Amino acid sequence: MLMYFQDSFARLMTIHHVAAFDIVKQHRMWVITEVQMDIRPTVTYWSEDFTVEIWVSELTSLRIYCDFRIVRKDNEQLIASGTSQWNILNLDTKRLETTDFLADKLTVVPELMTASHKKVRFPKPQSFDMLMEHRATRLDLDFNFHVSNRSYVTIALLTIPDEVLASQTLASVIVHWLHETYLDETLTCHMSHIDDGSYLHTLTNAEGIVVCELMSRWQQQPEIPEVSEVLNRDL
């Protein structure tokens, strides 16, 4: 779902001529720093059509907030919704730039805000329930040769216990991306089971610097149809 949202974000920015390949000519780069997503307990199939609705809900001097909904195309049943935070990075100075040049290009729709834009503060656990190391490979990289933001999510969720995966499905996820990492770097993921039933995943680099924080919450899996029911669908 994160992939579909990011692809839709790229398409929206392309329409407004401020996509990654547009602003790189001005030595600028899009950087996603946070995403919050709520996921409904529903079963989707590979052959189903769905729609991603996306819009800018707030534009501040340094941040762009983009909200989204993913719905089934046939009945508009909600599959997932959320919000994201983006910044513009100057490639020469490695500092954040203002969003002034976007003001006349993007339409802001604040009344459709799907979630609060107030920064979520993660708890600081005193102990960890699991520790896992991961060495970044080429499969983890994006087109900028950094570890992809989606790779951090994949690595973090590998620390979820098997018994949870066997009976539950993801209900919500909050991700903070803090620092870049690269090929062959070793990432350490510390997982803690929080009192409210959520799981906190903290990824650090070899220097112990936190590069990504993720909070996942899980819910009971919906009833899954028999294989025969799936095969008999009118596709």
Predicted regions and their residues:
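Hot-dog-fold acyl-thioester-processing enzymes
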Residues: 1-32, 81-83, 90-171, 223-235
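Small beta-barrel nucleic-acid-binding modules, principally OB-folds
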Residues: 28-42, 168-180
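Intrinsically disordered, low-complexity segments enriched in polar/charged residues with Gly/Pro
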Residues: 29-30, 55-58, 74-76, 125-127, ...
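HotDog/MaoC-like acyl-thioester-processing domains
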Residues: 36-38, 44-122, 181-183, 192-235
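Acidic/His-leaning functional-site neighborhoods
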Residues: 132-217
